[in-house]
Amino acid sequence: MDSTTATAELGWIVHPPSGWEEVSGYDENMNTIRTYQVCNVFESSQNNWLRTKFIRRRGAHRIHVEMKFSVRDCSSIPSVPGSCKETFNLYYYEADFDSATKTFPNWMENPWVKVDTIAADESFSQVDLGGRVMKINTEVRSFGPVSRSGFYLAFQDYGGCMSLIAVRVFYRKCPRIIQNGAIFQETLSGAESTSLVAARGSCIANAEEVDVPIKLYCNGDGEWLVPIGRCMCKAGFEAVENGTVCRGKGRSAAGAHWQLGGQAGKGSGLELTARRSVARLSQSSRCSAS
């Protein structure tokens, strides 16, 4: 899911209605996108929630969330009360189908699972606004294991002045690869950032396993690690194309002979010349002997 690709309103659910508001905004390249903003800093006891639509898990075990946002510096707001915040909370809720309503799940931690409190590295002031200076923060968080069909994300504001510019949800996987003479299929990363998921390889054509069963491990960043075992070309074959193909050793030579010899059943010019030379040599030998 990538909110920046939306061509119409995102239509996420807000609670209460006086909290988050969907507006047209701009990304760091000044492209028009749909964003959400909230700025109720002069009212105490804020508890504003924003919930995404249902996001399907698609087999992933660990979910990554990239957030781009801007936050107003509380000290730059005149007469702002001490309740002004420069952070917000990220939550998720798992479900087997799109079951959420305006009141379910309840707008609170438990049933929602808190991922983290998100803080800005940079905040903007009134001076930045006047000069149209964009100070966009990018933060990535992950959570898992997830096991149900999908999930929702929620963003909780409790007294800040901020704009949620973009949200991208993704998972990591190790790509299909040929290594050590074996094919390893695409493999999803594990449920934890430190997980190593074992993947069994299958030998390429005309190759066979040697020593121990061949495997690779997919780490949490979608990278292949720790190769174990290997496949080697069978007798009569050799590895070519960086070890991705086992080719018959005589195939290249046979092809070269076919090109020199011309079409099957017909002698080439080289062959005819050679035969005539041999015939002349035989005649010369007979004449000398007589």
Q: Where do the model's predicted regions map?
A:
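Basic polycationic patches enriched in arginine
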Residues: R251, R275-R276, R280, R286
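Short amphipathic, basic-aromatic surface patches that mediate peripheral association
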Residues: F69-V80
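Leucine-biased recognition of intrinsically disordered, low-complexity hydrophobic segments
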Residues: L260, L270-L272, L281
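Extracellular beta-strand-rich recognition modules
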Residues: I63-F69, S149-D157
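Conserved N-terminal submotifs of small, disulfide-stabilized extracellular modules
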Residues: W20-D27, R34-F42, W107, W112-V146, ...
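Extracellular glycan-recognition surfaces and repeat-rich motifs
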Residues: M1-Q37
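Short beta-strands within extracellular/lumenal beta-sheet-rich domains
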Residues: Q37-E66, S75, I136-R141, L164
